[in-house]
């Protein structure tokens, strides 16, 4: 077939060259955005008198027809037409005649594809924000049910201090809240229009870029035509934000995997989110959590891939930028899928409160409570730390725990120890007493839950 840009060429490319250069196999995902962008463009052309109202109406009718066909997956794309833009233009001309060729007046594929991706990410980021809020809602519900569920808090994966399970869950709530904030802030840079920037230098036609942007629901335009067609920082920002979100999900999944093991038994995954072994009949594997952890790497890869593509490109457009889409599409699909799976997995898991409680009954996670006890009686904390360290050493040598040490032994270490010491050794009491702002104390958790509910708003109770 003849190319829409083929006027200056005398030889046709080999079929394998066409296939190598074509992007229609993946950029057809932009079909709705491409057609909607074209409708806005031709509407602006008519307003400015660049095409007649009759021509614009005929073009819009043709585009609306193609849009409906696209929604029903009835469009047939060809490699020969290279990309989504030329495929749609070719179909339009076939549908309404040569007047369809006027659609591209005052526009280049360079600003057209950038516009498509802005519109695509606008829709997808808003969906990801909603999915993240739904996951946060599940965390709120789990936290409400586990305010007084006591578990070990860890540093270096060693038991450190007793905490509320709700406190642990809410840590991820606030991480996700920052993820939401990052996505919301990125919409300021996504919701601007490159349309009308042309190939790189603008156009001689008296277009109205602000009007086109308004029709597309965007909040403004790029102020520099070179910038508009040659940068992909809005995609990089999306990939970066998504990498941080996936890192948070991956860390949580790592803990879920550990907690569901026989060594911990803190939680049990629902059968819906676990699989078995083809050889070992007893196995219940946390495959969905492992997949989320694994898929985090591919999102990182998409970010670094595009950063590497962009780092050496001179202004303005270069064909290298065709590599900006597949990683973006893959990241959207991966993030949306992981958020959905994560929400279901957390909503249906069973919390083994007894096992969590047992894990802090016979250990040394209450050692800091004793140091704080001495410090509250006026002893410098460093001296208190030294005394408690010796007590822990004494216990490990005797095969006992701090709760088993008689008061006489405590008094040998410091006369500040009294009978009330044993009250602070209780894990429940230790958690309850940590009532500083943002701490694991029950009253602080209740305050945090109220704030969290206010942030997820309409999703609470769903």
UniProtKB/Swiss-Prot annotation:
Check the record and name the InterPro entries matching this protein: Arg_succ_lyase_C, Argininosuccinate_lyase, Fumarase/histidase_N, Fumarate_lyase_CS, Fumarate_lyase_fam, Fumarate_lyase_N, L-Aspartase-like
* Record keyword Methyltransferase present: no
Q: Report the principal subcellular site.
A: cytoplasm
Cysteine disulfide partners in this protein: none
The GO molecular function terms of this record are: argininosuccinate lyase activity
Q: Name one GO cellular component term.
A: cytosol
Please list the GO biological process terms of this entry. Answer: arginine biosynthetic process via ornithine; L-arginine biosynthetic process
For this protein, what is the EC number? Answer: 4.3.2.1
Localization terms from the record: Cytoplasm
**Pathway the protein contributes to:** Amino-acid biosynthesis; L-arginine biosynthesis; L-arginine from L-ornithine and carbamoyl phosphate: step 3/3
Q: Kindly name one Pfam family recorded for this protein.
A: Lyase_1
Q: Keywords, A to Z? A: Amino-acid biosynthesis, Arginine biosynthesis, Cytoplasm, Lyase
State the reactions this protein catalyses: 2-(N(omega)-L-arginino)succinate = fumarate + L-arginine
Q: Which NCBIfam families match?
A: argH
Identify its protein family. Answer: Belongs to the lyase 1 family. Argininosuccinate lyase subfamily.
Indicate what this protein is called per its UniProt record.
Answer: Argininosuccinate lyase
């Amino acid at each position: 077939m003849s190319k829409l840009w083929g006027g200056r060429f005398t030889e046709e490319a080999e079929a394998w060259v066409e296939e190598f250069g074509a992007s229609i196999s993946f950029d057809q995902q932009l079909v709705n955005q491409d057609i909607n962008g074209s409708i806005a463009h031709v509407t602006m052309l008519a307003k400015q008198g660049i095409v007649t109202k009759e021509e614009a109406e005929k073009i819009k009718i043709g585009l609306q027809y193609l849009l409906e066909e696209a929604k029903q997956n009835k469009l047939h794309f060809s490699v020969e037409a290279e990309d989504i833009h030329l495929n749609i233009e070719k179909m339009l001309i076939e549908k309404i005649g040569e007047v369809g060729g006027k659609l591209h007046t005052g526009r280049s594929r360079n600003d057209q594809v950038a516009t498509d991706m802005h519109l695509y990410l606008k829709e997808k980021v808003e969906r990801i924000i909603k999915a993240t809020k739904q996951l946060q809602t599940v965390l709120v519900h789990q936290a409400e049910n586990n305010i007084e569920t006591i578990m070990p808090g860890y540093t270096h994966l060693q038991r450190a201090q007793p905490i509320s399970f709700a406190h642990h869950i809410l840590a991820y709530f606030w991480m996700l809240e920052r993820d939401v904030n990052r996505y919301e802030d990125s919409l300021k840079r996504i919701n601007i229009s490159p349309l009308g920037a042309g190939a790189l230098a603008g156009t001689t036609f008296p277009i109205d870029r602000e009007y086109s942007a308004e029709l597309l629901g965007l909040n403004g335009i790029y102020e520099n035509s070179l910038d508009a067609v040659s940068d992909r920082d809005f995609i990089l920002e999306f990939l970066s934000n998504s990498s941080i979100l996936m890192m948070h999900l991956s860390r949580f999944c790592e803990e879920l995997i550990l907690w569901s093991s026989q060594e911990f038994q803190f939680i049990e995954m629902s059968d819906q989110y676990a699989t078995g072994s083809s050889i070992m009949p007893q196995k219940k594997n946390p495959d969905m959590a492992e997949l989320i952890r694994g898929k985090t790497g591919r999102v990182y890869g998409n970010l670094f891939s595009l950063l590497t593509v962009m780092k050496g490109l001179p202004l303005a457009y270069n064909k290298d930028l065709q590599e900006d889409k597949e990683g973006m599409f893959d990241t959207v699909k991966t993030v949306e899928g992981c958020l959905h799976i994560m929400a279901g997995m957390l909503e249906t898991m069973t919390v083994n409160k007894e096992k969590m409680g047992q894990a802090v009954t016979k250990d040394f996670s209450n050692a800091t409570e004793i140091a704080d006890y001495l410090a509250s009686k006026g002893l410098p904390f460093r001296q208190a730390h030294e005394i408690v360290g010796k007590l822990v050493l004494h216990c490990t040598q005797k095969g006992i725990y701090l709760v088993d040490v008689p008061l006489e032994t405590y008094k040998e270490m410091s006369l500040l120890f009294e009978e009330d010491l044993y009250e602070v050794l209780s894990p429940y009491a230790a958690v309850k007493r940590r009532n500083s702002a943002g701490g694991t104390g029950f009253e602080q958790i209740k305050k945090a839950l109220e704030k969290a509910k206010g942030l997820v708003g309409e999703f609470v109770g769903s």
